[in-house]
UniProtKB/Swiss-Prot annotation:
Disulfide bonds: none annotated. It catalyses: uridine(54) in tRNA + (6R)-5,10-methylene-5,6,7,8-tetrahydrofolate + NADH + H(+) = 5-methyluridine(54) in tRNA + (6S)-5,6,7,8-tetrahydrofolate + NAD(+); uridine(54) in tRNA + (6R)-5,10-methylene-5,6,7,8-tetrahydrofolate + NADPH + H(+) = 5-methyluridine(54) in tRNA + (6S)-5,6,7,8-tetrahydrofolate + NADP(+). The gene is trmFO. This is Methylenetetrahydrofolate--tRNA-(uracil-5-)-methyltransferase TrmFO. It comes from Synechococcus sp. (strain JA-3-3Ab). Belongs to the MnmG family. TrmFO subfamily. Its EC number is 2.1.1.74. Transmembrane segments: none annotated.
Amino acid sequence: MPHSMSRAETLAPIHVVGGGLAGTEAAWQIAQLGVPVILSEMRPVRQSPAHHTDQLGELVCSNSFGALASDRAAGLLKEELRQLGSLVIATADRHAVPAGGALAVDRARFSQALTEAIANHPLITLRREEVTGIPEGIAVLCTGPLTSEPLAKALQAFTGLEYLSFFDASSPIVTGDSLNRAVVFQASRYDKGEAAYLNCPMTEAEYERFCQALVEAEQVPLKDFEKEERKFFEGCLPIEEMARRGKDTLRFGPLKPVGLVDPRTGSRPYAVVQLRQEDRAGKLWNLVGFQTNLKWGEQQRVFRLIPGLEAAEFVRFGVMHRNTFLNSPQLLLPTLQFRRRPTLLAAGQLVGTEGYACAVAGGWLAGQNAARLALGLPLITLPPETMMGSLFQFISSADPKHFQPMPANFGLLPELEGQKVRSKQERYARYRDRALAALAATGLVRQAQTA
């Protein structure tokens, strides 16, 4: 559906706040559907502590969008976006640099190209201004992990204080089918209620070896602005810091074994690591109390010392950093609309997704649906078999009590029908084929190709 100036003149502009990856994608998708857009970006009027330029879509961390191969979760997500006509992914493809099996970009040329595309679109007005309140009318919030204080306060007032977080302290998540079920047992303490936890029992020797590895592992250094804002770290001690406080700190804390019996021995273990179910299907499991600041490679090495986790597949590593994000299961629909105000949408890291491609995906969906609201067209909810559909289904329906940001991963997708596929490579290839077929069946790919 190409843009039309004559039709656009009769429509009120949609306001997109934030010129990162999500906001840039949202603005482009809205304009491509023929609806005028105001894109507000506060840089350079007000600089964030992490950005260095005034360019749109500036990559403040790595220059990599993750795996290229479409039989990897990040690669499948990008392939879906390619087929749906994503500006950001097309720009990344054009400015790619050699990076093995990943899509990495020349970050300066990439953000320059995005800025020029937005500035030159006849239906997009780029405003360099700080937005301090929630806009009226149809609007999309894409303000990212470092949302400015005035707008964050406005969001708190709109959503309720308890539904906006300023600090991300996430524990790692592993896949259920990668656990050693000969060691791991399912039980709740004192057999109370449902056996909702998986338990990894430790002997004294295993516990001591784990604690030693934990305190010796390499940590991620805090950014300067995170050091200055230590209040975000209070009351949420990394597990490696707890281990440094003494031999018994962990086993009287998150690793306490009370009320649990190892069925292999018939007695209480010396310590226990508990895993909590993260999704309805029981495919993803969270290491309870394992918020950590260890480097990702170190997390994999150290946490695989836990009995039962020797071959654990990590779909998300633990992080501790400054991150403004919504309690999306409480607030958002799978269309990325706010439940209490359907003309307001959100996308990017603000909604609790992790990674560049996930931010782009949110921008695509929020932009499409904002434009469709303006045009009186049916809104899009993507099929759960697609990576995009499963991601936004998850963030809008996860347990709000334990919600933490989530990256794209195959654990979010529905199980394959028929006989269980043991080969991981074949299973992922089938996930990919099913996802792309489901996406094609929506007709959205055909629309993107003719736009």
